[in-house]
Amino acid sequence: MAVKGFRPTTPTRREMTMCTFEEITTSTPEKSLLVSLKKSGGRNANGKITVRHIGGGAKRKYRIIDFKRNKDNIPAKVVSIEYDPNRTAFIALVVYADGEKRYIIAPVGLKVGDTVVSGPESDIKVGNCLPIRNIPVGTVIHNIELAAGKGAQLVRSAGNSAQLMAKEGDYSQVRLPSGEVRYIRVECRATIGVVSNQTSEIVNIGKAGRKRHMGVRPTVRGSVMNPNDHPHGGGEGRSPIGHPSPRTPWGKPALGYKTRKNKKYSDRFIVKRRHDK
């Protein structure tokens, strides 16, 4: 997938880039796999903002993605590679031999006409999904389950991949994109290959309007707020923040302050932290 630039007709067009989407084969999604999405504006059921900078944006339909890949030993043919506005990766529409249609996350190299299979006896081939127990050590994988049968939760965004490092009894060691090495049970499933749309991370948004179309609202600096809105707010003109170190809007230390719980259950499954050398 290539990235294209634009003629500098405006200051924003000078810097703006976008994907060419040459892998996309259709612009019409499968209607039976669409559901409506209601905008929340970043608010919870009580109307309170729980996620800042969310609101507006283009209307979307949610594509129902098969993260479980539990239809075993039935080959599925790739009918189309499609754009999904709800994620950075592309998705593939597959039709099983019995006629059922499903969307899956499209890996790099998957093309229209290819066949993918799920199950313990599947070949080690891009797009196939099988338990980690049956995947050779060193294989590049994505779409990884944390609990068997729950559906993939890890390594699902554009251009990402993990690597199977070792297998020891009921657990495997998987190196995640962050560099963290983690224990994952061998009965959990993973898909072979790298997630599609690898150039997503080098795209330059270029202008605020593109972010607004994506449903992202502006981020205001705390130093220009009032003191009742932010710890950095208030004062005459460009005042110092008035604290030994920066603070979040809720008064907690910002910039490097650890917020993860010290006694989290999943700590026991982390073999190597992402910051460890």
From Swiss-Prot:
It comes from the Bacteria. The keyword Cell inner membrane does not apply. GO terms for molecular function: RNA binding; rRNA binding; structural constituent of ribosome; transferase activity. Pfam families: Ribosomal_L2 (PF00181), Ribosomal_L2_C (PF03947). GO terms for cellular component: large ribosomal subunit. One of its GO terms (biological process) is cytoplasmic translation. Residues 219-277 are annotated as: Disordered. Keywords: Ribonucleoprotein, Ribosomal protein, RNA-binding, rRNA-binding. InterPro entries: NA-bd_OB-fold, Rib_uL2_dom2, Ribosomal_uL2, Ribosomal_uL2_bac/org-type, Ribosomal_uL2_C, Ribosomal_uL2_CS, Ribosomal_uL2_dom3, Ribosomal_uL2_RNA-bd_dom. SUPFAM superfamilies: Nucleic acid-binding proteins, Translation proteins SH3-like domain. Gene3D superfamilies: 2.30.30.30, Nucleic acid-binding proteins, Ribosomal protein L2, domain 3. Coiled coil: none annotated. The keyword Ribonucleoprotein applies. One of the primary rRNA binding proteins. Required for association of the 30S and 50S subunits to form the 70S ribosome, for tRNA binding and peptide bond formation. It has been suggested to have peptidyltransferase activity; this is somewhat controversial. Makes several contacts with the 16S rRNA in the 70S ribosome. Part of the 50S ribosomal subunit. Forms a bridge to the 30S subunit in the 70S ribosome. NCBIfam families: rplB_bact. HAMAP family: Ribosomal_uL2_B. Belongs to the universal ribosomal protein uL2 family. This is Large ribosomal subunit protein uL2. It comes from Clostridium botulinum (strain Hall / ATCC 3502 / NCTC 13319 / Type A).
